[in-house]
């Protein structure tokens, strides 16, 4: 049943974070409706921009929108004209001041949403679906992915009856919660109808989301996260930092060990002399 669940929602709070960060009580439904409208606006007129995801963060009088895109030049436009137009439409939609941030996706071959869009564009250009799937899989594996699965569903090749086919390469765990599995979906518009493209990309195991947030905050502050060890306070009965591990002997410096070695060697020399 792992194939029926969206990997982002399945691992939410464990290895993935929320794409909308705000709190509301009575205005909850209005904010959800605005978020859907914002994301629909970003994907409707910018198919060529390669938008991976849109993150929304709200405060009392401001809305921050982060657009992750593979082609930031298309989103920004000439001298920032396109970015100003988007900001104006967002302010008109939300009625608040909008802070627009355009972020570049460094490795688009490993982003599931961008891979799904690339396959859909090839299907719209009448490229064979098998060739499009295999080409995208090869480029993703060369870019560093540990596993990838691509599935296309619809009237494949213009067939009268719709079906779905998938290709998989590498390892794609669907039920392992610590696995960093990216998921993307896009629809290709063809002359025979729409073809849905789903992409799963496995990038390796990650830590807990709380540890990741703590490490990122420590890195921004320039301090390393403190770890428990020999400097921790004493516990019950005064047993504290000296208990580094059971069965371990306390380490001594080489300077302290040298007199003990000389003292042990002196009686041995005396005993050999008496026997002679």
From Swiss-Prot:
Biased composition (Low complexity): 216-228, 254-269
Family stated for the protein in its record: Belongs to the universal ribosomal protein uS3 family.
KH type-2 domain ranges (all copies): 38-106
Any one cellular-component term (Gene Ontology): cytosolic small ribosomal subunit
Organism of origin: Streptomyces griseus subsp. griseus (strain JCM 4626 / CBS 651.72 / NBRC 13350 / KCC S-0626 / ISP 5235)
Name of the protein in its database record: Small ribosomal subunit protein uS3
Entries under InterPro entries matching the protein: KH_dom (IPR004087), KH_dom-like_a/b (IPR015946), KH_dom_type_2 (IPR004044), KH_sf_prok-type (IPR009019), Ribosomal_S3_C_sf (IPR036419), Ribosomal_uS3_bac-typ (IPR005704), Ribosomal_uS3_C (IPR001351), Ribosomal_uS3_CS (IPR018280)
Record bears the keyword RNA-binding: yes
Quaternary assembly: Part of the 30S ribosomal subunit. Forms a tight complex with proteins S10 and S14.
Keywords: Ribonucleoprotein, Ribosomal protein, RNA-binding, rRNA-binding
Biased composition (Basic and acidic residues): 229-245
Gene: rpsC
């Amino acid at each position: 049943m792992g194939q029926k669940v969206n990997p982002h929602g399945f691992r939410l709070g464990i290895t993935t974070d929320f794409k909308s960060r705000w709190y509301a009580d009575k205005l909850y439904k209005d904010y959800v409706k605005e978020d859907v409208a914002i994301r629909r606006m970003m994907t409707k007129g910018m198919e060529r921009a390669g938008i991976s995801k849109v993150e929304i963060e709200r405060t009392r009088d401001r809305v921050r929108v982060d657009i992750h895109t593979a082609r930031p030049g298309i989103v920004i436009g000439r001298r920032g004209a396109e970015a100003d137009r988007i900001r104006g439409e967002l302010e008109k939609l939300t009625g608040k001041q909008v802070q627009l941030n355009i972020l570049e996706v460094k490795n688009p071959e490993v982003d599931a949403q961008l891979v799904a869009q690339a396959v859909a564009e090839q299907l719209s250009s009448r490229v064979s679906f098998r060739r499009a799937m295999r080409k995208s899989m090869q480029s993703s594996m060369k870019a560093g992915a540990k596993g990838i699965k691509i599935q296309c569903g619809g009237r494949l090749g213009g067939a009268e009856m719709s079906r779905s086919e998938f290709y998989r390469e590498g390892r794609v765990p669907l039920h392992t919660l610590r696995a960093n599995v990216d998921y993307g979906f896009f629809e290709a518009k063809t002359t025979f109808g729409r073809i849905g493209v789903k992409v799963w990309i496995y990038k390796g195991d990650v830590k807990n989301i709380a540890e990741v947030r703590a490490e990122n905050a420590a890195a921004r502050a320039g301090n390393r996260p403190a770890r428990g060890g020999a400097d921790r306070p004493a516990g019950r009965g005064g047993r504290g930092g000296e208990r580094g591990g059971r069965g371990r002997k306390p380490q001594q410096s080489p300077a302290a060990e040298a007199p003990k070695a000389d003292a042990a060697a002196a009686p041995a020399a005396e005993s050999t002399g008496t026997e002679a």
